[in-house]
């Protein structure tokens, strides 16, 4: 039985990894060179259904394969994807199960998370305003990025207007999730909280790893911070789309597959059994 479950899990990881890679091909290009895609969304659904380690493998293998195909000459990009996507997928699956098992107050934490995104909005807006007088622009238009002074060097940036716009959308979404959480099922609240935390980690991780790996392997650190900042809008928009789709797609998918032995999950199954017993005793 155990060997069968492991075999089923390997097959499902392979299928979801292929879908994740395919989802990364569904993309909208951003002016700064990055793109919005559906790879993260597939990884999140896999993590919610299969668990943290499996979800991490799906993201790492699926989006890592895409990078191997198109960025084989950029080791920093491939390494960043393999590391970060595993971490993000693991966080989604682990937090989701922890929230359900421990009956965490998701509404309270959604308010707290909304506050964190509010800080991100404020900081990014300050950068945008302060950078408006910079005299050298790297990309132009609505997604313009400008040089400025950081650490005493001429490497300042005017953050894209996309960053504060989508940061405030994240803030509103998190707070609205807390306010209207009574309309969501317990699972939907758990999905919303776990995915928002993971996306926050993904945005921060994308910036830090791009800055460090690009600085170590490709260019200097001053140039790499400009490159890392220019990619933030794509990460934010992709994350926002992933959150919205995950909240509304997971529940019907879960109901369709929850009785299948291939998707058996000890923690979730035992939690549901305990809830049924509590209802019977009442």
Predicted regions and their residues:
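Loop-helix junctions at membrane interfaces
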Residues: 1-282
């Amino acid at each position: 039985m155990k060997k069968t479950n492991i075999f089923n899990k390997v097959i499902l990881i392979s299928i979801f990894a292929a879908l994740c890679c395919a989802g990364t091909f569904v993309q909208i290009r951003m002016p700064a060179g990055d793109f919005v895609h559906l790879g993260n969304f597939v990884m999140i659904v896999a993590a919610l259904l299969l668990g943290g380690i499996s979800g991490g493998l799906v993201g790492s293998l699926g989006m890592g394969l895409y990078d191997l195909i198109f960025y084989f000459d950029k080791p920093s990009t491939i390494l960043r994807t393999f590391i970060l996507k595993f971490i993000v997928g693991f966080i989604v699956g682990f937090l989701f199960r922890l929230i359900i098992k421990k009956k965490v107050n998701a509404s309270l934490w959604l308010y707290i998370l909304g506050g964190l995104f509010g800080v991100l909005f404020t900081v990014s807006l300050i950068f945008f305003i302060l950078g408006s007088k910079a005299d050298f622009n790297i990309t132009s238009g609505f997604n313009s990025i400008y040089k400025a002074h950081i650490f005493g060097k001429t490497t300042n940036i005017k953050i894209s207007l996309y960053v504060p716009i989508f940061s405030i959308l994240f803030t509103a979404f998190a707070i609205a999730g807390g306010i209207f959480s009574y309309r969501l099922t317990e699972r939907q609240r758990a999905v919303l909280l776990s995915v928002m935390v993971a996306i926050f980690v993904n945005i921060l991780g994308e910036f830090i790893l791009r800055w460090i790996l690009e600085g170590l392997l490709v260019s200097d650190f001053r140039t790499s911070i400009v490159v890392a900042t220019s990619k933030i809008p794509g990460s934010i928009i992709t994350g926002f789309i992933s959150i919205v789709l995950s909240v509304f797609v997971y529940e019907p998918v879960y109901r369709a597959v929850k009785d299948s032995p291939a998707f058996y999950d000890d923690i979730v199954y035992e939690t549901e059994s305990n809830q049924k017993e509590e209802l019977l005793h009442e």
